[in-house]
Amino acid sequence: MLNNKTQNKKIFLLKEVMWLLPVIVFATFIITLSAKTKVPFYPVPMTMQTFVIMAIGVAFGKRVGLLILLTYFLEGLFGLPVFAGTPEKGIGLSYILGPTCGYLMGYFITVYLSGNIKDEDKILTRITKLIIAIIPTYVLGFMWLGTIFGWNDTIIKLGVAPFVFAELFKITLLALLIPHIFKLKKYLKS
């Protein structure tokens, strides 16, 4: 016979899993939608994927954010067309090791760092933390592009520069939405 403490722990874990499963499924679906939805932008179309990755870190914290991103990554690795450009540009490992690999790897750091944002942070603190959070995605993306295509001005022109203002817009928008995200989170958890 289990003692009360052990039973309570098992009930808590079961409740946690029952809460996490739909969250993970929903969040990976939202990441996929954000990757597939192209916003017209010059010279390269942009997606809202970085916005969603940061929002997941903010909303669910580091641990759950990483778990969501790992699930999304594994879905893509096993051949589900969850990434931008899939299945047209390949699926699974062949897509992951393509031009976007560095960005995909950077998402893990970005979601983790976004999980550091607190409800009580002031707007400028939120913006600063989000800028710091997105930098690894672009650094790793830039490094990977340079490794596979060679180091030239084109990498900066196509792989980083076009997205700077778009990222600043997304970061500002998310920073303004953070209080609402935390309110919704508290409501859903109650």
PLM ranges: what are they?
Residues 23-31, 53, 57, 68-76, ...:
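Alpha-helical transmembrane segments in multi-pass membrane proteins
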Residues 57-59, 63, 79-85, 142, ...:
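Juxtamembrane membrane-interface segments at transmembrane alpha-helix termini
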Residues 33, 37, 59, 86, ...:
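Helix-loop junctions at the membrane-solvent interface of multi-pass transporters
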Residues 1-66:
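Hydrophobic transmembrane alpha-helices
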